[in-house]
Structure formats: structure tokens, C-alpha cells
């Protein structure tokens, strides 16, 4: 891992680290969203659907902004706490983030997902559970810092998904995009779309 993958926050304390969602994950999910939704306005026009294609375009843009906002998550670790934050332009009702002082961390518990994966939750002394972000660049470094701050053994904690999984998904997404583009261009050349 290169040192420029994890940004240090010079304006805060010397030891604060910022971990962002991996660019591979961000690009893959944004491309998948565009690829899956791009045909909808064209299909609405061809099938004479009761929903105008303009409304679909508007909904797609709103959805894209919402997805991008969710993918702007940042995990900040400093001497006092772990924090999950979002940029100021993201409304708090949509994604409000959380913070947990290191002194309040009681344990790190594993849970199985519906798909058979493993996720981890911080348990606070008050019984609240906070999801450990697992799709960040520098995950291993982040987990080492969590272990150093809490004393909880994190040697068995691994990322939820590996980069090759997102590379495969990105490859299939690009293939689907090519099929979408071919279908839309063919429909336009046949005069089915205006």
C-alpha cells in the first residue's frame, strides 16, 4: 500500500487519518448504476409508457447524486475517536454518519450477511452497534490503528470483498454498457427513437 492512499489531516491532530471508499468500488458502482438506468427513458419512449422520459431522466440524475453522496463516505481515526463522515453538501437526513470515542468501544463483533459474507460492528459500552466500514482504501492499516487504539485483536478481520470481485463486476458492467449503447443506437437508426 502506498502512503498517498490514506490522507493525513494536517489541520487536525498529527495522528488523524482519513480513509475513503476505494476508487475502484466507486467507479464500478457508479458505472453499474448508469448502465442499468440509461435504457429506461429510451424504453419509456419506445413503449409509449405513461411516465414521460423527462421524469425518468430527472429520477436518474437524483439517484446518481444520491449514490455519489453515499460513496463519499470518509472514515476518520484520531487519538480520541473513530468517525464516519460525509461532505457538507450531503443532507444529514440522507447520511448522517457517526462517531465513537475509543474509550466507549467495548468490543468488535462479527455478523454474517444474508449472502454469507462477514461484517463487523463496534459495540459501545451503552450497547449501541456501529458498522465497521470495510470498503475503504487502506483497510488493513485502518484495522491496525483500531487495534492499537482499543486493544481488541483484529488479526482475523478481512475486507468484505476483494478487488478482483469489483474488477469482474466492472468488466461485466462495461459489456452491458456496450449492449445498451448498441441497442439505443440501433433503435435511433431505425427511427424508433427521436
Question: Across the structure, where does each feature detected by a protein language model lie?
Answer:
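N-terminal membrane-targeting/pre-transmembrane regions
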Residues: 1-47, 127-128, 135, 141-148, ...
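Short small/polar-residue motifs
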Residues: 2-6, 68-74, 103-107
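Short, exposed beta-strand/loop patches in secreted or surface proteins that constitute
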Residues: 9-11, 74-75, 121-123
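Hydrophobic alpha-helical transmembrane segments
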Residues: 26-28, 45-60, 194
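Short N-terminal micro-motifs specific to bacterial/archaeal maturation
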Residues: 41, 45, 58, 73, ...
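Conserved beta-hairpin
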Residues: 60-101
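Non-transmembrane, membrane-adjacent beta-strand/coil modules in membrane-associated proteins
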Residues: 84-144
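Juxtamembrane boundary at the C-terminal end of a transmembrane helix
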Residues: 178-194
Amino acid at each position: 500500500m502506498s502512503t498517498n492512499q490514506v490522507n493525513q489531516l494536517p489541520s487536525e491532530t498529527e495522528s488523524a487519518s482519513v480513509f475513503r471508499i476505494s476508487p475502484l468500488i466507486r467507479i464500478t458502482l457508479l458505472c453499474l448504476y448508469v448502465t442499468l438506468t440509461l435504457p429506461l427513458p429510451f424504453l419509456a419512449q419506445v413503449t409509449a409508457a405513461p411516465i414521460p422520459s423527462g421524469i425518468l431522466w430527472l429520477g436518474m440524475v437524483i439517484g446518481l447524486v444520491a449514490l455519489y453522496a453515499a460513496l463519499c463516505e470518509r472514515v476518520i481515526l484520531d487519538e480520541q475517536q473513530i468517525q464516519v463522515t460525509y461532505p457538507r453538501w450531503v443532507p444529514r437526513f440522507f447520511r448522517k454518519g457517526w462517531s465513537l470515542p475509543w474509550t466507549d468501544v467495548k468490543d468488535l463483533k462479527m455478523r454474517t450477511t444474508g449472502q454469507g459474507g462477514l461484517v463487523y460492528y463496534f459495540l459501545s459500552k451503552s450497547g449501541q452497534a456501529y458498522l465497521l466500514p470495510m470498503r475503504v482504501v487502506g483497510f488493513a492499516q485502518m484495522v491496525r490503528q483500531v487495534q492499537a487504539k482499543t486493544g481488541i485483536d483484529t488479526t482475523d478481520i478481512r475486507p468484505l470483498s476483494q478487488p478482483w470481485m469489483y474488477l469482474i463486476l466492472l468488466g461485466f458492467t462495461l459489456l452491458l454498457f456496450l449492449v445498451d449503447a448498441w441497442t439505443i443506437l440501433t433503435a435511433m437508426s431505425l427511427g424508433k427513437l427521436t
